[in-house]
Amino acid sequence: RYYTFNREDEGEVNERMGCSAQWFKTGHKFYAVRDDSRKVEDLWLIDALAEPRPRLKTYKAELAGDKNVIQFELLIGDANTREVKKINIDRWKDQYVDILYASNDAKRLYFQRYKRTWDECEICVVDTETGEVKVLIHEVDKPYLDYQMRAIHFLNDGNEILFRSERSGWGHYYLYDKDGNL
């Protein structure tokens, strides 16, 4: 439950959680982000509307200043070879990771990682054959990056990336090529 492929934002349905594992379009490779919240501390709420009596709800929650926060792993598997690779995505301590786009040929997987302070991020691509990670875009925005306004679009199967940034103080879109060149 706390070292899982289930994504919290998928929501619980009949005590079942959604899974972060996704198939590439080719159908023989898959990728998944695994969340490790085993060391994250518990938080409690009282459900005062529960019948017949109020009920205590316990869940894991990260709070500002906590030493133990969710850790992320990226795995890529190949059903034909029955091989699963753990990809080295570590850049910053306690980083946050999002999958952005999977190429049609299953050779590239794009992800974004954020520094815990949310003032720095990187758009990266993984070569699914070798497991090599390459940084395409490195963004710094003080005091923090606006996660709600982020916009990243992959055009022509990842050959071009349209990326929204406020690096100038204003929100602008920048067009990058597949190698991260502006």
Predicted regions and their residues:
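Structural motif
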Residues: 39-45, 71-73, 118-124, 169-174
